[in-house]
UniProtKB/Swiss-Prot annotation:
Assembly, per entry: Interacts with the terminase small subunit; the active complex is composed of a pentamer of terminase large subunits and a dodecamer of terminase small subunits. Interacts with the portal protein.
Lineage: Viruses, Duplodnaviria, Heunggongvirae, Uroviricota, Caudoviricetes
A single GO molecular function term of this UniProt record: ATP binding
Species per Swiss-Prot/TrEMBL record: Thermus virus P23-45 (Thermus thermophilus phage P23-45)
Binding positions for Mg(2+) 1 per the UniProt entry: 294, 429
Name the UniProt record assigns to this protein: Terminase, large subunit
Domain remark in the UniProt entry: The N-terminus contains an ATPase domain. The C-terminus contains an endonuclease domain.
Sequence segments annotated as region (ATPase activity): 22-197
């Protein structure tokens, strides 16, 4: 199937002004387009335009947006809905039917305006939102086009075994978009279509290994929005280097999966072991302290890290296991009192009401910071990693602490999502205790961590649809023939 391309006239119908990278994507006729772009660079918007164009330019076309989760698929799906509803007002020989809960959109095509006497339906185009976490639900369809969003987070087997076969009968096209996540299959597909020569951030980009069916596009966020370059460079001060290079620089970074790439910047302090405590320094009346408390469950350890807010150093760390809730709280209270009644930042998630009630009963000054989701955990860990890269994290020079930091890694789940956890059957209690403590630290450059609000899992129609548009229409005459009376 020959891929049609949109005209400038079609862009005008949508009020859409594509930037240079979006325009290159729209003008490409490759069957497999791979777009590796930084965050907020318009790749999702361009993808929504591609879908709208097919639904109108090819009556009867069938296409899907596939993302790691339904919530992610709903983003582009919502944008497509908004654009389709807008175009339906321009082309009276079309009728839109939306089944939002099923993420299903139908565009009915008629031989004349819908309200004209004798109007007959001649074809129906269909667009659906799908999740890659259930590959078996992707099998069996016959499609004209597929859009893969955040493709780097989708396992290759989902593409090769479930998605690609749906395009075989009609020789359909695929638009594969993502920010990079290491050197996985998305990286390999990108190289198959890259013709831009040697470029920083793309390993082996100077090696010509392209495939005629592929074309790839690459841009950092500031390449797309050069007027905002200063803003992006400021973000680099507040985001771990690896995360910044991947998310905004769109770099394919090869790494050992270690979350803490700044371990060589870690400040190591001599300490004295006192029972279950590693003591770097005793209480100083003129200093302010806080304690990051990660309570142990089952075989986990309980770890309490005392942070000197004036120096940014962990001056005491207590680690224990096998203790009852009451014993853990009693130890925490004693530690707090030893450091001038230091206030506590406690992860109270998953330990029930017992800990909270015990903390209240003991009169401990604490702030609950429940690590109730991967989002909260990632924000806390990213803050710790950033401070470490800046040389602002100081801990006791203890092998257990260093091993736990070194073995805290990124992993990919079966559904393609990226998670952080300890290697193998290791523990992450020290990591979480440190992250909780340093969430209260104002860095030497004035940076202060703030926990961002979590995004709702479901978006209302008005919120999930954006009025920004990106579309492509090859030939307006084709559209006129399809929709005129």
């Amino acid at each position: 199937m020959k891929r049609l391309r949109p005209s400038d006239k079609f862009f005008e119908l949508l009020g859409y002004k594509p930037h240079h990278v979006q325009l290159a994507i729209h003008r490409s006729t490759a069957k497999r387009r791979v777009a590796c772009l930084g965050r907020q660079s318009g790749k999702s918007e361009a993808a929504s335009v591609e879908a709208v164009f097919e639904l109108f330019a090819r009556p009867g076309s069938q296409g899907w947006i596939i993302a790691p989760t339904y919530d992610q698929a709903e983003i582009i799906f919502g944008r497509v809905v908004e654009k389709v509803e807008r175009l339906a007002e321009v082309f009276p020989a079309t009728e839109v039917q939306l089944q939002r809960r099923r993420l299903r959109l139908l565009v009915h095509h008629y031989d004349r305006p819908v309200n004209a006497p004798g109007a007959k339906r001649v074809a129906t185009s269909e667009f659906r939102g799908k999740s890659a976490d259930r590959p078996d639900n992707l099998r069996g369809a016959t499609l004209d086009f597929v859009i893969l969003d955040e493709a780097a987070m989708i396992p290759f087997s989902v593409w090769s075994e479930a998605i690609e076969p749906t395009l075989s009968v009609r020789d359909g096209w695929a638009l594969i978009i993502s920010t990079p996540k290491g050197l996985n299959w998305f990286y390999e597909f990108f190289l198959m279509g890259w013709r831009g020569g040697l470029k920083e951030g793309i390993p082996n980009s100077g090696v010509n290994q392209t495939h005629p069916d592929f074309e790839s596009f690459h841009a950092a966020s500031w390449d797309v929005w050069p007027e905002r370059r200063e803003w992006y460079m400021e973000r680099r001060l507040y985001i771990p280097d690896l995360e910044f290079r991947q998310e905004y620089g769109a770099e394919f970074v090869s790494h050992s999966n270690s979350v803490f790439s700044g371990l060589d910047m870690l400040i190591l302090l001599p300490y004295e072991r006192r029972g279950t405590r590693l003591v770097v320094e005793d209480y100083r009346p003129d200093h302010i302290y806080c304690i990051g408390a990660d309570f142990g469950k089952n075989q986990d350890y309980s770890v309490f890290s005392v942070l000197d807010l004036d120096t940014g150093a962990i001056v005491c760390l207590e680690r224990m296991n096998g203790a009852t809730w009451s014993d853990q709280v009693a130890r925490l209270k004693a530690l707090s009192e030893d450091y001038g009644h230091a206030y506590v930042v406690a992860d109270t998630w998953g330990v029930g009401d017992a800990i909270a009630e015990e903390l209240d009963a003991q009169g401990i000054n604490y702030t609950p910071l429940p690590v109730k989701s991967s989002s909260v955990k990632e924000q806390l860990i990213s803050n710790l990693a950033l401070l470490m890269e800046k040389g602002q994290v100081a801990v006791p020079n203890d092998k257990t602490i260093l091993d736990e930091l070194r073995n805290f890694r990124y992993y990919r789940t079966a559904s393609g999502n990226q998670v952080m956890r300890a290697y193998g059957r290791g523990h992450d209690d020290i990591v979480m205790s440190l992250a909780l403590a340093y969430s209260q630290y104002e860095g030497k450059d004035g940076y202060k961590f703030e926990l961002a609000e979590e995004r709702p899992s479901k978006l209302k129609h008005e919120e999930s649809v954006m009025s920004l548009v990106e579309d492509d229409f090859t030939d307006l005459e084709l559209a006129n023939r399809a929709f005129s009376a």
